[in-house]
A protein has these predicted regions:
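PLP-dependent class I/II
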Residues: 1-273
Length: 273
């Protein structure tokens, strides 16, 4: 597995956003004939980034050009559960795309129901794999979702309840970060979707793995960013400036717990900058 490091745009409000480095991606595809697939998530776990429509269209065109599938993890995306906070993102599929979705984020996690949108050949192959991996898969999730999808009710629930619920929590968590980290060299990836915030602490003097251990001692659980840089055997990934300076934060918990966790995180960060 190889990661293609993203381009990064910084903004005046202590936010930033990742963009696909297509020059680097196309160079890699042109020089490596062993690439079997491309994989992205939209919205992205852990950053909350949403690939732009032009980015997803260009990726699909490259997949078609090189005869490989583009796997898109759409667990938080459109049209449901619609944990997407920007207006200029649209669902996308063509025959180069294998789109994976889930009922978990719409409120049915225990059914463990995934949805694949793909060509009939790929869908059949994945169905065969699933039959081997799970001999007797449950059908409760499919049965519950079938009518909701057919009537469009699931899209309305996502738009009217799920999306605003998480967007409010995201905005509140970002406001607390600005309050507690004031004066620090902190940057928050623009929260465009999903249930996570991606915090970049540029002047942190320890790695986020070390910071994680200090936070855990205080009862605060985060996920250090090193785990999300897949393909770290590639020197380019190891040299990424964000590799050991970022944390994934889950903002979906009770407000008082999230607020106190962010306060403690800021306190420990300031002790190690």
């Amino acid at each position: 597995m190889v990661s293609i490091p993203a381009r990064c745009q910084y903004y005046d409000d202590h936010s930033f956003k990742y963009f696909i480095d297509f020059e680097l991606l196309e160079s890699h595809l042109a020089s490596h004939d062993d690439v079997g697939a491309m994989c992205v998530s939209r919205p992205t776990n852990p950053t909350g980034n949403v690939l732009t429509d032009s980015e997803i269209h260009r990726l699909a065109a490259l997949a078609s050009q090189y005869g490989i599938p583009l796997f898109v993890d759409n667990a938080y995306g459109l049209p449901f559960p619609d944990i997407v906070f920007i207006d200029d993102a649209a669902p996308y599929w063509d025959e180069s795309v294998v789109l994976s979705m889930s009922l978990s984020k719409i409120g049915l996690p225990s059914f463990r129901t995934g949805i694949i949108v793909a060509t009939p050949e790929i869908a059949a192959a994945l169905s065969n794999v699933n039959a081997i991996a799970a001999l007797a898969s449950g059908s409760g999730g499919q049965e519950i979702a079938r009518n909701c999808i057919a009537t469009g009710e699931i899209v309305q629930v996502a738009k009217n309840y799920v999306q605003p619920f998480y967007q409010k929590k995201s905005q509140q968590a970002v406001a607390w970060i600005h309050e507690f980290f004031a004066g620090g060299d902190f940057w928050v990836h623009r929260s465009e979707g999903a249930i996570f915030l991606w915090l970049y602490l540029r002047d942190l003097k320890i790695t986020t793995l070390e910071l994680y251990k200090k936070l855990k001692e205080r009862g605060v659980v985060t996920v250090p960013g090193e785990y999300f840089f897949f393909g770290v055997e590639d020197p380019v990934a190891q040299c990424h400036g964000h590799y050991d300076k970022c944390l994934r934060l889950n903002y979906s918990g009770p407000e008082e717990e999230v607020r106190e966790g962010l306060r403690l995180l800021a306190e420990i960060y300031k002790e190690n900058r």
